[in-house]
């Protein structure tokens, strides 16, 4: 996903995917998010940071606005990335930085919203403690810790994002050793139809398009690997067209692979790759072949085939791709996705829902002033909007780990992945408008200054605890800010 957040390859892009509804919808969402979110968050940051008195609530929402503003600043790069059909013209550093900013926004926002929820809960259930300990300094310290944790959660994105070159264009994606995952994989065509061996995804600087003729030799099996100097086109072979006992060719997910140069391998090994009598019955060159598009498996008639039977150096060819010979998703990709789901969504969501449920229950039982629900209402709606925007992103991320991209469901997930990323980014433009609409009556707010609107939304007003005695002195001590 990343990344913004999410993440096969076609030479001509005949399908013109940027004309498809999901891509158009994504571009519209990203454009509106940038046009509305940048001035909106910038205005809130300027007024709340420079014009308003610093309170605990102001600190919370000030840092939340800063996270949203950083996300909005990265949106032009994401929009251009989508408009260029997955091409990345901004270089390696921004390939790492831009997705990291989007993930940073996600973690910082959800951690800040969780802190706001816990703060609301403490105000209601522990008013005396809040009266003595809840202050601006503590809020700033908590926000600082939140930013540190959010930066730590971005490290995997910054480490694993790399530039790949395909069709003479740079593309940005994840690289896990010999495995890779490009952004916007549905921009690329069928990897086995009308594909030239020149158009192979390669990390720049790591391998050349043309190599000198060479061969791999082992003591057990003589493997001759002539280098292909001219573009070759391979069509998907049928199972019946292959000789009995020959190695069958299975399509590999090119959109998620990093490939070596275009080599045609002519193994002189026993038919079916048997282990016992591997020094007899050499095959001719037509019995089996392997291109860098394809993955090699022994036929049903063969005995067990081990990767160690391959000559040294060719084993790297065998394991290229996002999936290994057991069709397993790379462990780092699984770890990144699950961590985002649990730490960046499920756990904070449970905490926020529990906090606001307890608050609603207590408010229904107690005597709370109408003004007390002001910031509470703003916080609840902000949390709800966050969950709506980010839920599809995490669902699609998990499904992408469990679904074969070549199935109809997998292709649908790839097509709508852009929309999920755009919707998650759109969360960064909603909050300024929520602040303006939820404090007081909208008609009154329309006549107020921006500073007055924000002061109403982030107000720190005294309210009375539900269990305060009638004694005025004790009642005043039990009052706290909301």
UniProtKB/Swiss-Prot annotation:
Post-translational modification Phosphothreonine, affected residues: 463
Residue positions where Phosphoserine is found in the record: 459
Regarding the membrane, this protein is recorded as:
Multi-pass membrane protein
Which key words are in the record? Cell membrane, Chemotaxis, Disulfide bond, G-protein coupled receptor, Glycoprotein, Membrane, Phosphoprotein, Receptor, Sulfation, Transducer, Transmembrane, Transmembrane helix
- The yes or no answer to whether the keyword RNA-binding is present is no
Q: In which tissues is it expressed?
A: Widely expressed in several differentiated hematopoietic cell lines, in the lung, spleen, ovary, placenta, small intestine, throughout the brain, heart, and endothelial cells. Mostly expressed in lymphoid tissues.
Q: Which residues carry this modification: Sulfotyrosine?
A: 174, 184, 318
Q: Identify the glycosylated residues.
A: 9, 194, 266
Residue intervals passing through the bilayer:
24-46, 58-80, 97-118, 140-160, 341-360, 378-400, 418-438
Q: Which Gene3D superfamilies match?
A: Rhodopsin 7-helix transmembrane proteins (1.20.1070.10)
Summarize the PTM comment: Among the sulfation sites Tyr-174 is essential for binding of C3a anaphylatoxin. O-glycosylated.
Cytoplasmic side, ranges: 47-57, 119-139, 361-377, 439-482
Disulphide-bridged cysteine pairs:
95-172
Annotated GO MF terms:
complement component C3a receptor activity; complement component C5a receptor activity; G protein-coupled receptor activity
One Pfam match, given by its short name, reads: 7tm_1
Please name the InterPro entries in this protein's record.
Answer: Anaphtx_C3AR1, Anphylx_rcpt_C3a/C5a1-2, Formyl_rcpt-rel, GPCR_Rhodpsn, GPCR_Rhodpsn_7TM
Q: Where in the cell is it found?
A: Cell membrane
- Topological domain ranges for the Extracellular compartment: 1-23, 81-96, 161-340, 401-417
Cellular component annotations (GO), alphabetically ordered: azurophil granule membrane; plasma membrane; specific granule membrane
Q: What is one GO biological process annotated to this record?
A: calcium-mediated signaling
- Family, as annotated: Belongs to the G-protein coupled receptor 1 family.
Function in brief:
Receptor for the chemotactic and inflammatory peptide anaphylatoxin C3a. This receptor stimulates chemotaxis, granule enzyme release and superoxide anion production.
Quaternary organization: Interacts with VGF-derived peptide TLQP-21.
**PANTHER family annotated for this entry?**
C3A ANAPHYLATOXIN CHEMOTACTIC RECEPTOR (PTHR24225:SF28), CHEMOTACTIC RECEPTOR (PTHR24225)
**Listed name of the protein:** C3a anaphylatoxin chemotactic receptor
Organism phylogeny: Eukaryota, Metazoa, Chordata, Craniata, Vertebrata
Gene that encodes it: C3AR1
């Amino acid at each position: 996903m990343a990344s913004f957040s999410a993440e096969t390859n076609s030479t001509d892009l005949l399908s013109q995917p940027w004309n498809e509804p999901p891509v158009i919808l994504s571009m519209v969402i990203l454009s509106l998010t940038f046009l509305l979110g940048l001035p909106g968050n910038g205005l809130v940051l300027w007024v709340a940071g420079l014009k308003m008195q610093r309170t605990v609530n102001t600190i919370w929402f000030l840092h939340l606005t800063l996270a949203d503003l950083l996300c909005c600043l990265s949106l032009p790069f994401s929009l251009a990335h989508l408009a260029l059909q997955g091409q990345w013209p901004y270089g390696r550093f921004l390939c790492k930085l831009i997705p990291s900013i989007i993930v940073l926004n996600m973690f910082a926002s959800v951690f800040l919203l969780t802190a706001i929820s816990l703060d609301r809960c403490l105000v209601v259930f522990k008013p005396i403690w809040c009266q003595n300990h809840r202050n601006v300094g503590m809020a700033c310290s908590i926000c600082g810790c939140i930013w540190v944790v959010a930066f730590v959660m971005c490290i995997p994105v910054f480490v694993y994002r790399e530039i790949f070159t395909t069709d003479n264009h740079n593309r940005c994606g994840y690289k896990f050793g010999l495995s890779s995952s490009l952004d916007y994989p549905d921009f690329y065509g069928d990897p086995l139809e009308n594909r030239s061996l020149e158009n192979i995804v390669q990390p720049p600087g790591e391998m050349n398009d043309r190599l000198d003729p060479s061969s791999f030799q082992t003591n057990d099996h003589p493997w001759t690997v002539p280098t292909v100097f001219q573009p070759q086109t391979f069509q998907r072979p049928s199972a019946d067209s292959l000789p009995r006992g020959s190695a069958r060719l299975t399509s590999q997910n090119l959109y998620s692979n990093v490939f070596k140069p275009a080599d045609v391998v002519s193994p002189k090994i026993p038919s079916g790759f048997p282990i016992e009598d591997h020094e007899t019955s050499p095959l001719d060159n037509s019995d089996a072949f392997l291109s860098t598009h394809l993955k090699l498996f022994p036929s049903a008639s063969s005995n067990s085939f081990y990767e160690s039977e391959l000559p040294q150096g060719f084993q790297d060819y065998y394991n290229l791709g996002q999936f290994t010979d057991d069709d397993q998703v790379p462990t780092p990709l699984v770890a990144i996705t699950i961590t985002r789901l649990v730490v960046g969504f499920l756990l904070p969501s449970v905490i926020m829902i529990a906090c606001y449920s307890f608050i609603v229950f207590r408010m229904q039982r107690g005597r709370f002033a109408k003004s007390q629900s002001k910031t509470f209402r703003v916080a609840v709606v902000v949390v709800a909007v966050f969950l709506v925007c980010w839920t599809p992103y995490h669902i699609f991320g998990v499904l992408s780990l469990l679904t074969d991209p070549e199935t109809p469901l997998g292709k649908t997930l790839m097509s709508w992945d852009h929309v999920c990323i755009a919707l998650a980014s759109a969360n960064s433009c909603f909050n300024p408008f929520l602040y303006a609409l939820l404090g007081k009556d909208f008609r009154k707010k329309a006549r107020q200054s921006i500073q007055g609107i924000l002061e109403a939304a982030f107000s720190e007003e005294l309210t009375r605890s539900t269990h305060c005695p009638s004694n005025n002195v004790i009642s005043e001590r039990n009052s706290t800010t909301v």
